[in-house]
Structures are given as structure tokens and as C-alpha cells.
Amino acid sequence: MPKVSVCMITYNHEKYIAQAIESVLMQKTNFDYELVIGEDCSTDKTKQVIIKYQNRYLDKIKAIINKKNLGMVPNFIQTLRACSGQYIALLEGDDYWTDPNKLRKQVDFLENNQDYSISSHNVYVMQEGSKNQPSEWLGRKHKEISTLEDILEYGSGGATCSLVFRRKSIIPLPKWFYTLPSGDWPLQVLCTSKGKMHYFSEVMGVYRTKHSNNSLSTAIRQALEKGEETIGLPYKNTLKVIDIFDQHFKYRYSKLLKNQEIYAYYNLAHEYKQNKEFIKARYYALNSLKEIFGWYPYLSPRRIIELIKIVLISYYENSKPPN
């Protein structure tokens, strides 16, 4: 049995998947590891690239080729459950690692620090098509130790491609995980409910800002198929996840979650304003303001003023006589 399983989900990553796989194969370790790839019925040649690599590395690569598109979270869960290692590392098919010692560094840390359940590291963020230099995800001054409370209040403690965690921290998955619209933040919450998170400030990977954001595109397609609205979908998903967390933790951390809730309402207000749906923009702006003044001001004064403007604009726009 391998000590580490690398869990890689992919969909329409023909241009990037080889680089992702090669960055796994270059790892220098003193333990066995496997690469488990969940290929979600891509419409390009991603599958062919994966099969080519699998045939060359039969002892290292295990490919799960879906006959129909499952969607991001079901594909992730299926791939995750196929991982047998004591530790699991995440890497999506359009990201890649840059440090050949990445796995060893993170696993060694977890082996020597049993009160930690997960580790992350700094990464470069590469914006597709941009000529700008890559920026760092969290930077070198990000706090070294994060707790459950930190992850609930401030969100992700690291890019997906930086995460290595103990399998026993999340398996078996709780039933609610199967209903999630997205899995990154909840996975970190599950892990930090069992131990602390350690952050390496050194850059050991590259997170590619999604060219077409395949995971989001899948979610939007599925919403359209159900006749659901797609405006502000990521932020609506955040609100759904917050509700799940509240129920899971029996509302012990509701106040901490207000930070994420307020930002979700803030972003929804802006998206509806941009789409000139002023009644809905006002609804979310008022929700954000209500939470701010009901708890304490997470948003800057500038953003609070922006929300008030959205409310006033919505009243003005809806009071205009029809043309």
C-alpha cells in the first residue's frame, strides 16, 4: 500500500494535464506513492494523454475514466475514495508542482507532528493569457499555524494544489459532503476539526486561474439544466456551505462564519447590480448590512458605503417610469 496518494481530478485539461502528471512523477521521496486520476468524460483529448501515461507507469498511475460527466464534486469524491494512501495530496489537472521535494517535506512534517492533520504551502498564481509576473497565493507572511476557527472565519488556508492531509481526517466522508456544491473549503474544515494546519511559506507549486473555470462551468451548466439562475453562483454556493457547517457544528461557530456570509452577500449585491437586477441587488446589500451592524463590521467603510449606494440606486432605478 502506498504511503501517499495523489488525488487528481481533471476535465478538458488537454493543454495542461501532461505538465501536472510530470510534476507528480518528478517527486523525490523515500516512500511509495500513487497517482489516482479521475477523468470526468472530457470533450478534448485529456483522456488519451492520461491513458498514454498510465500505460508507461502501470505501477504508479491509476486512472478512473468516467463514461459520463459526473461534475466536479462527485468526480472528486469518487477519486478521493479510490485513494488508499495514509496521506492524500491534491492536484487538479491544470495546476502543477515546482518542487521535487514537496511531498517529502509535507509528509515528513505530518509524520513528526501528530497534532497536525493537514499542511499547505505558498504557490504562484498564474493568470491565463496574462503577461504579468505570477503573484503569490497567500504570500510569505501568512500565518504558519491555522486552526478550525481560522478556516471557518477566513476561508481557505491554501490553494488546492498545496494540500496534503491525513486520510483518516476525512474518511469516511460525512453524508453532507455528498451534497456540497464545492469541496475545497469543506475539506479543510473537516481536516482542521481533527488537528491543526501547517503552512510552508516557500513556493512549491503553481495554481492556474481557470482559463474557462471548468469546475464553475460544470456547475453553471448543471444549474441551467435544472432551470436555476446562474448569477453569483459561487457566492450562493458559499451560503449553502455555511448553512451545512452551521448544522454540522450545531451552530457553535455561527459568529465566526459571519465573515464569509457578509462577503457572499456583498459580492451577490454587486453581481446583481452589474446585471441591472436592482431589487435582488438591494436584497443582498441589505442582508450584508444587516449582518454587519448586527455583529461587527467585517467590511471596510468603503465597501459599506458601496452597499448603501446599491440600496439607494435600486430604489431610484425601480422608481423610474416605464419607457
Each predicted region: which residue ranges?
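Short, acidic, metal-binding catalytic loop of nucleotide-sugar glycosyltransferases
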Residues: 22-32
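Short aromatic/hydrophobic "clamp" motif used to bind/position activated sugar donors
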Residues: 88
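Conserved donor NDP-sugar-binding/catalytic core segment of glycosyltransferases
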Residues: 101-134
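A conserved acidic beta->alpha catalytic loop
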Residues: 39-48, 68, 92
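Glycine-rich, basic loop-to-helix element that forms the pyrophosphate-binding segment
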Residues: 66-83, 105
